[in-house]
Amino acid sequence: MRPLIRCANAADAPRLPAMFTEYRTRDLPGIACLALLALLCPASAQDFDLVLAGGRVLDPESKLDAVRHLGIRDGVIRAVSAMPLRGRATVDASGLVIAPGFIDLHQHAHLPADYHLKAQDGVTAAFELEVGTADVDAWYAARAGQTLVHHGVSVGHIPCRMAAMGDRPTFLPGASSVTATNPASEAQLADLRRLVERGLERGAVAVGFGIQYTPGATQWEILEMFRAAAKFRAPCSVHIRAKGDTGPLNVFSSIQELIAATAVTGAPAHICHVQSTANRHTPRALELLTAARARGLDVSVECYPYTAGMTDIRSAIFDPGWQERAGIDFADLQWPATGERLNVASFAKFRQTGGMVIVHSNPESVVREAVAHPLTMIASDGLRGHPRHAGSSARVLGHYVRETQALTLMQAVEKLSLLPARRLEGRVPAMQNKGRVRIGADADLVVFDAAKVRDRATYDQPDLPSEGIRDVLVGGVFVVRDGALQRDVTPGKPVRALVK
């Protein structure tokens, strides 16, 4: 039986008046009545900064799914009660869901306007884990005290490779760049590992890889980076080496490369956007990863809930043979700025000028299976120009939970919050207090209408905010209230591993 009110410590518990702390046996009936009143009326015994009253609380860790009242003080959940609570402010959440704030492990865009869209999609913590940075200190310093949501970054194999090879730093390397094409010399490999380890010493939460963008990187080089990660108990967040199912380099050999690296080094492997890289082979890719986990290997996987991807048209992904590898053609490519579908001529033009291109590569059935699979967590791969940036969380809740019933609401909340938190907590212990609705957890919360939540962003209008998400709190501070973005607050904090 669950207690009617649970408090963080003895000091928070309802107390009887001091006159009843000593009593005789004949006083028991009266004291029992007063004790019952204290339990039935906890509002008279407890003050909070904020109370979220009467919402349907979903806690994916304990599987609590019940109407509760939450008491928040100093940015932390201090009480989860079946009975009313008293606070300096009370917000009625009746008829709405209260869930842990969503955690996005794959968000590339980290400007204030990007965080605005993330908050309106229920995200309270956003991480750049795939590409990452070569300068961890500078990345965090650029956002200090200025963010709506919590934020974190990996040290990236791509930017560190650019630095080690003396290449011009860009977001992703061009297909003909030395970063993309050249194997690392012994000296460059040593420099690359030094840069990665330095980033981990400065608190990077993971090591990021985009191996498909750096085909010149050997398997030994990747293994060396996994060894560096293992020294710091850091997960490796990886865009795998290849697509397709033919030739020596394919989606299966690429996943096996990471499974082997984890087995040899002990560094956890996290596979990025499996439905985007595996495409029609996604079910078999997930079968491989499930089998690896069943044998005790620490591997995890993410997906996003859209049938199209987006990447740089200049990258090695579009080297000759891309149609066969991905099972698509020119007409499946869409230029975000104009909405046009490409042909041979326009592809050649944009390949020269560069830019991000939308890639329509999956049937809905593949995405649905990926979203619903027990192993996957949800991560947006968020970039401006694609609806996944603004609407991934709401699309899961609206389309895949309510409309198609591919998974339950509790399962969706777990994929959006608890599973991402668990992926990072081995490296960043503070993540143990995120992704949960329990006493002592951070008050990073989302309040939404399960009957109305939906994504509004489209491929033609990719920056439309989600709807049906009424309130979002970051550290107990409203960043979305009554559906309105709160632009004058910056409660977001850096999520960072121990800095040496």
Language-model region placement:
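Conserved N-terminal entry element of GNAT/NAT acetyltransferase domains
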Residues: 1-10
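Active-site microenvironment of metallo-dependent hydrolases
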Residues: 33-34, 43-68, 73, 82, ...
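Active-site neighborhoods of metal-dependent hydrolases
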Residues: 161-168, 175-217, 259-263, 267-409
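Helix-loop element at the rim of GNAT/NAT acetyltransferase active sites that forms part
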Residues: 19-28
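Divalent-metal coordination cores built from histidine and acidic residues
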Residues: 93-98, 112-208, 297, 306
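Active-site metal-binding motif and surrounding structural segment of the metallo-beta-lactamase
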Residues: 83-99
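Metallo-beta-lactamase
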Residues: 101-108
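Divalent metal-binding pocket/active-site signature
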Residues: 189-190, 198-256
